[in-house]
Amino acid sequence: MKLLISLLWSIFFSIVYSEKTLLNFKHYELCNGIYSKSESGGSLNPAIYVNWTEPWGQEDEVEVLIFNWKEIRKLGAFRSDDQFTYICDYDAVYTDHLCEADQLGLYLWNSTSAKSIRSYIIPTNADPQNIIYEISQSGYYCIWSHSKKMLPYQALVNWQNAYGGLPASQFPRMPISGGITIAYSVILALWMFFRFQYKHSIVTVQKAIMFLLIFSCAQQAVTSIVLDTENLRNRGNFTWLGETLVSILFACQLVLDLALLLILSWGYTRYSTNMRDRLFTEAKIPLIICFFALFVVRFFAITIQSIHLGLWFCFFFLTACISALYILFGAFVALPSTLRALVEQRYYTLHSIYKIFRIMVLCGVVTIFSFSLVALIFCSNTNNNSTNKLWKIRWYFLDGWIDGVHLTYLITLSSLWRPSQENPDLDPTGLSYPVLDPRLEEELDLLEEDIRADKSK
């Protein structure tokens, strides 16, 4: 219990730390993407707000530098010994002649050619003036701060986009989540149309697929509602509860996918106690690990405001991918014996479906493995140079692709097992059930003992 509490506390601390909305003498650099009004639309004026919170009254000056990362090369200068510096110090003034004496302790930057760079010098011996930096062009903006006397200071930074309060890293999720909800609704409507036509011959697999379609449609609808609420209102208790609910539904959805895929690969097309026992015996632990890891991955991805998610996200993402690949590999290994059993018992319609199903499982293994490598590269890379180019699509390569894989998976299953006149051929009885029947195993053991006894005589 203590270990679990420590783990949960570490996760919470990582989330709070990764938010990085406080600017102070320890975290003197903040970077984030922000959209312009012309690109994202909306009624608000996009801007970066820096509101000072630390008590003042000390003799000091704090310089705040805000700029678009594209102009990073216009900051700093080389010394005479080829060392690069961003701050005007005594050597920069009297030895290298890079700045004037009245610029001591300030940032070095090219004020003649810079377009987005703004410098704000805040005296701390009085009530400091809050900073408003207006955004006219979408980009990856950074805030650098520096105290001349290295005294403590603190400010709260708000990255205000024109469309609302949703962070720029989460903005693409909102329309795409709504689009996926519509896609699930269309698939579900078509499925219900075929189901109504052949309602008297619906088999168990088709009922499971219909449940997954309804569950996925509801999950995406809840995600859209939570994101829209967070965009219209400030973050509060409802937002945290909504993000937790979205993460739980997301993890449940994918665990149900993996469980159904594994059950079908074993050849079970209807519920039985043998199927349940086999699932609990062979896949219970991987499914539980996958559920917890997927919950944390989605919760981190939609909760953390910063572009950089941290090492905890990488750890849980890797755990989720490994457990999912383990289950998929087990399904792929079990499929050849299922295909042979289908041929032996002359279930040719189901055999043709399972051949396509095997290709789908193999494609799932390759897709998850490939996207996992790309996501880990994105997650572990905290270089601002690369983030500046990829901050708009970074969300997709981290965890957004999982929704696309799930949508493709459900479309394929719905197409293969769609209700039709061949419904009875899609649910053979006795295909794999006797394999793990304990009574049959006892009879086989007794038969083997009798054979050994006869041979010994």
From Swiss-Prot:
Pfam families in UniProt: GOST_TM, PTM1-like_N
GO process annotations (BP): cell surface receptor signaling pathway; retrograde transport, endosome to Golgi
Record topological domains on the Lumenal side: 19-173, 229-243, 306-314, 380-457
Cellular-component GO terms for this entry: cytosol; endoplasmic reticulum; endoplasmic reticulum membrane; Golgi apparatus; membrane; plasma membrane
Keywords, comma-separated and alphabetical: Endoplasmic reticulum, Membrane, Receptor, Signal, Transmembrane, Transmembrane helix
Cell location: Endoplasmic reticulum membrane
Single annotated GO MF: signaling receptor activity
Transmembrane segments: 174-194, 208-228, 244-264, 285-305, 315-335, 359-379
UniProt signal peptide: 1-18
Residue intervals on the Cytoplasmic side: 195-207, 265-284, 336-358
Membrane topology per record: Multi-pass membrane protein
Family: Belongs to the LU7TM family.
Protein name in the entry: Uncharacterized membrane protein C18A7.02c
Taxonomic placement: Eukaryota, Fungi, Dikarya, Ascomycota, Taphrinomycotina
